[in-house]
Amino acid sequence: MANFGPKDIKKLREMTDAGMMDCKKALTEADGDMDKAVEWLRDQGMGAAAKKAGKVAAEGAIGIKVEGHKAVIVEINSQTDFVAQNDKFKALMDTVVNHAFENNLADAEAINNSTINGEPFADFLSQQIAIIGEKLVVRRAALIVGDETTAVNGYVHSNAQNGVIIEAKCDSAKTAEAMTPVLKEVAMHAAAMAPSTLSFKDFDPKFVEDETKGRIVAIETENEELRRLGKTEKNVPQYISMSQLTDEVMAAAEEALKAELAAEGKPEKIWDKILPGKLARFISDNTTLDQEQCLLDQKFVMDDSKTVFEYVQEKAKAAGGSAEIVHFVRLEVGEGIEVEEEDFAAEVAKQMA
């Protein structure tokens, strides 16, 4: 005689999301013991997870946790965006984010090689795959751990498709406290504007060189069409990043500007008043890459009269101190993952065969 009834089967199904017949078989194997039945389903789930291993997980969500001078960000991928929106997936995200935060796990490798609730993380994730029903991958993660003079904050977009954690070094604990809400604003900016790096100093020289050539070709091509239409052509920049504006380049630019002023008949005694503005314009015209991709050089989305760098400096000064953004991490779900396009009709035919 079975030591369980329909209510037990229903309860086990609600707990695990496993099929009705699988729950009945699990309870039979466990002689009605609910915990053992869950364990039996988990063991079977490992096999189910293995079947899903070949699937591409390119959807998912981003989760963060910020507390004090510490922050963590995690990307978990699933196969469909639908799954990433369900409560079980969200609960998994909370568990993994808290696990990474509490154990100072600095990246996805550290998480995947960790132990959670007394078992290998890989086993825990396999159980979640069985419960949720799709391949799941903890793909990326990052950790910030500061001290009392470090301001830390973060932001996740409402759809959980991108998120940011960020830190700034400050001159004092008082300034760090004042700058913490400011960093929340900057994190929101970074989530929206998607900077690829903190500063032009982080660019690879080869990338800047290739990007410069590409932009020149694109503008020259566009100018051909503008000429054909009799419209004003666009300026073709020599440079696109501050990393290219060496002392020699700036000295040459200054001499060229002086020659222009002389040609315009401007008195030499007023050049010192005119040159700073013209040099600033030269820098602005020749650092478009920085303005697009460097967080510190982007126009602040909440006040585009100043850059992010200028906004942070202004807020730090108002707090009676100084602060410098030293690091940020922005993750967007699925970036960099190649997904093969499937022939839906062929897939259906394959399953019907």
From Swiss-Prot:
GO annotation, cellular component aspect: cytoplasm
GO MF entry, a single one: translation elongation factor activity
Compartments, record wording: Cytoplasm
Location of region: Involved in Mg(2+) ion dislocation from EF-Tu: 80-83
Domain of life: Bacteria
Keyword flag RNA-binding: no
InterPro entries assigned to the protein according to its UniProt record, in alphabetical order: EF-Ts_dimer_sf, Transl_elong_EFTs/EF1B, Transl_elong_EFTs/EF1B_dimer, Transl_elong_Ts_CS, UBA-like_sf
Keywords: Cytoplasm, Elongation factor, Protein biosynthesis
Principal cellular location given in the protein's record: cytoplasm
PANTHER family listed in its UniProt record: ELONGATION FACTOR TS, ELONGATION FACTOR TS, MITOCHONDRIAL
Similarity field: Belongs to the EF-Ts family.
Function, in words: Associates with the EF-Tu.GDP complex and induces the exchange of GDP to GTP. It remains bound to the aminoacyl-tRNA.EF-Tu.GTP complex up to the GTP hydrolysis stage on the ribosome.
Protein name: Elongation factor Ts
Organism whose genome encodes this protein: Sulfurovum sp. (strain NBC37-1)
Gene transcribed to yield this protein: tsf
